Amino acid sequence: MDGNVLLAFGLTLFAGLATGVGSLIAFFTSRTNTKFLSLALGFSAGVMIYVSLVEIFVKAKDALTNALGNTNGYWMTIAGFFGGMLFIALIDKFIPKSSNPHEVKLVEDVNAIKPQVNEDHLMKMGIFTALAIGIHNFPEGIATFMSAINDPNVGIAIAIAVAIHNIPEGIAVSVPIFFATGNRRKAFKLSFLSGLAEPVGALVAFLLLMPFLTDVMFGIIFAGVAGIMVFISLDELLPAAQRYDETHLSMYGLVGGMAVMAISLVLLV
């Protein structure tokens, strides 16, 4: 178990640090490769949706039906699944639209923002975006950590998928802060800090959830994780992938992500 805990923390840290990668891309490239980003985000959504519905939801149902019986266990699984969706939806609800990490940002936005825009406003926008992404990343950290504790292979897949979708979030933080301050280091630091919410989520899961991890608690948490992952995929990843490129690339990425996840689960059984 100790080895799994260390791996789980490492995976959440890896996923969170991808926001810093996004800010570096914004600073050191002149154009956004929208086709690649669309394909990658679609792939990330495919991995998340497939592993959530085929692996995580099923494990949650098995744990709850074993503990509560078939009928009660299945109802509790459904409640946990949609409870996870409601949880992440409420987080999104209270994030201001201008700071929402769902808003697509491009590297070109660094040069596209007009100089007459108030710099204080841009700075506030960047800080609010960093806070919003931090809040948004917190439950993702819990989800990645708990998945890795139960099955490291599933945890690795989820961490990679989360890392991919954290890259454009890093761009969303760094663009307004860089333009407001002209300071790459400050923009990178705030982007980096927003990503640390994921390992903080993992730490909370370890300290508050792990000591009480009965079969019922495990099943409810895993059902909630599945709901969170599916909601993020449908509400964030796929729409963003389609906005980056309006062809079928996002759907090809989605199917590819599902296929890779399906094959890897079979090979790793």
Swiss-Prot record:
Entry binding sites for Fe(2+): N137, E140, N166, E169, E198
UniProt-recorded Gene Ontology molecular function terms: metal ion binding; zinc ion transmembrane transporter activity
Main location: membrane
Annotated compartments: Cell membrane
Keywords: Cell membrane, Ion transport, Iron, Membrane, Metal-binding, Transmembrane, Transmembrane helix, Transport, Zinc, Zinc transport
Family: Belongs to the ZIP transporter (TC 2.A.5) family. ZupT subfamily.
Name of the protein: Zinc transporter ZupT
The species this protein was found in: Lysinibacillus sphaericus (strain C3-41)
Lineage of producing organism: Bacteria, Bacillati, Bacillota, Bacilli, Bacillales
Gene from which this protein is expressed: zupT
